[in-house]
Amino acid sequence: NTYISANHPLYDSTVPTYPYDPAQANSILEQVGWRDVDNDPSTPRQAQGVLNVPPLTPLVLNYYTSSATQRRQASEILAQSLGECGIGVNVTYLSYLDLYAEGGAGGPLFGRNFDLAQYAMGTTSLEPPCSWFTTGQIPTESNNWVGANVTGYQNPEFDAACAWAQEQTPDDAAYREAYQSTQAIFTSDLPAIPLYLRLKVAAARPDMCGFALDPTANTLWNIEALDYGANCAP
């Protein structure tokens, strides 16, 4: 529902949610001019009176992601769901090098040349990464296509809320309020849809001690504390 996990201590559970509702989606599409002109839900809707879109243009989106198994599974589910609303989807699976290529070199992601794109984002801090969606993080030619905000989302109110949040410390009274403000704006504008959390999985021998996963660190972050067998205290 927002750009941080629901398990995060700063997650705002009061933000609005968007349930899966094809009937409501179809109604909204009809209202804005995307019509099911042939009365066939399996074919893409067509434009009738949509601003800046030629009449009868089919509603077909180009969707880019990597060829990883999990990405393929997610894209197939999303394409099927969008199809229930008369939205066609052309899914293109790219190598990591091609998907994450520099924008100036023709990369669809950092060049922001896509209708839909599925990609991974990660953080090594517990601090909510609101900067992912700030104006200064938009990849452009002027900043050598470096930046996390591949959506191109721009909202001065969000930028200000994020900057304010980053100025606070966890001990400040405004700390929670500041980050919840960014979540409220994000959820209202919804520049991106967080799909799922990637689980961190590891295995250890039964008599290993000191082994503990940290979501913000490498699996062997505390390698000095690891031991096994008789060396482990009861």
Mark where each language-model region is.
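Structured segments of extracytoplasmic/periplasmic soluble domains
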Residues: 28-35, 78-88, 102, 106-108, ...
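Surface-exposed intrinsically disordered loops and tails
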Residues: 38-40, 54-58, 101-109, 142-146, ...
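Bilobed periplasmic-binding protein-like "clamshell/Venus-flytrap" ligand-binding domains
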Residues: 1, 34-65, 110-117, 168-206
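Periplasmic binding protein-like
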Residues: 83-143, 178
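Active-site rim elements
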Residues: 13-16, 148-151, 163-173
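Long beta-strand-rich cores associated with HINT superfamily self-processing modules
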Residues: 133, 145, 202-234
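Solvent-exposed loop/turn segments at secondary-structure junctions
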Residues: 8-11, 67-70, 96-98, 121-126, ...
